[in-house]
Swiss-Prot record:
Catalytic reaction list: nicotinate beta-D-ribonucleotide + ATP + H(+) = deamido-NAD(+) + diphosphate
Database matches in InterPro entries: Cyt_trans-like, NadD/NMNAT, Rossmann-like_a/b/a_fold
GO BP annotation list: NAD biosynthetic process
The species this protein was found in: Fervidobacterium nodosum (strain ATCC 35602 / DSM 5306 / Rt17-B1)
Name used for this protein in its record: Probable nicotinate-nucleotide adenylyltransferase
């Protein structure tokens, strides 16, 4: 692999995308205007701290369709990569960062403020923050998790960019799954192209598991 553009910075936007929703695309839109960088959208196959029962290929397909809206805007800076499809078992953020550091001078992990709520559970989080930057968008109204991050990370917090001007996204994948099984509409929550498939997939999953979620 080589850098796909002349940028010396890459932004890694990962997650289970279970399912991808409008909040993900809004955050990427803001980030594209904030950072002069290449962006890599990397769906997680096997997250370290939770179980995701929906097949990786299905979620990757949803992400591909959801982010098609960027085909006419800075598309040469955005790369959707099925990197984790080819990794057996759990992968960790630090492994991805170490890979991208071979090709970029600067790496940035784009993540929500809620990541600071359990940052101690991240694999080698101190080492990770010594070699990369976290760009953190809001997930709470009072910014309480930013404050927690400052307390926990101490001097390492100098490697955190607070994206407080980004919109507070109060949509979550777990809320969407909950709405589906409760028979509520998710119109406007996910891209229209995946709306029916997302709804049917989670309804079938919920039914096949006796009304229980593993996640």
């Amino acid at each position: 692999m080589t850098s796909f553009s002349k940028s010396d910075t890459c932004v890694i936007f990962g997650g289970s995308f279970n399912p991808p929703h409008i909040g993900h695309t809004v955050i990427l839109s803001y980030a594209l205007d904030y950072f002069n960088a290449d962006f890599y959208i990397i769906p997680t196959k096997t997250p370290p701290h939770k179980v995701v029962d929906i097949d990786f290929d299905k979620r990757f397909e949803w992400v591909m369709k959801s982010f098609k809206c960027f085909d006419t805007y800075k598309k040469n800076q955005i790369f959707l990569w099925d990197l984790e499809k080819h990794i057996f078992g759990v992968n960790y953020a630090i492994k991805n960062v170490e890979y991208f550091r071979k090709y970029y001078s600067n790496t940035i992990i784009l993540v929500g403020e809620d990541a600071l709520g359990n940052i101690e559970k991240w694999y080698k989080y101190e080492e990770l923050l010594n070699i990369t930057t976290f760009a953190i968008y809001p997930r709470t109204r009072d910014g309480s998790l930013y404050k927690r991050g400052q307390q926990i990370l101490g001097n390492l917090y100098s490697n955190v960019i607070e994206l407080r001007d980004f919109p507070l996204i109060e949509i979550s994948s777990s809320d969407i799954r909950k709405r589906i099984v409760e028979g509520k509409s998710i119109i406007g929550f996910v891209d229209g192209e995946i709306l029916e498939d997302v709804t049917n997939t989670y309804l079938m999953h919920h039914k096949s598991h006796g009304g229980n979620w593993n996640e």
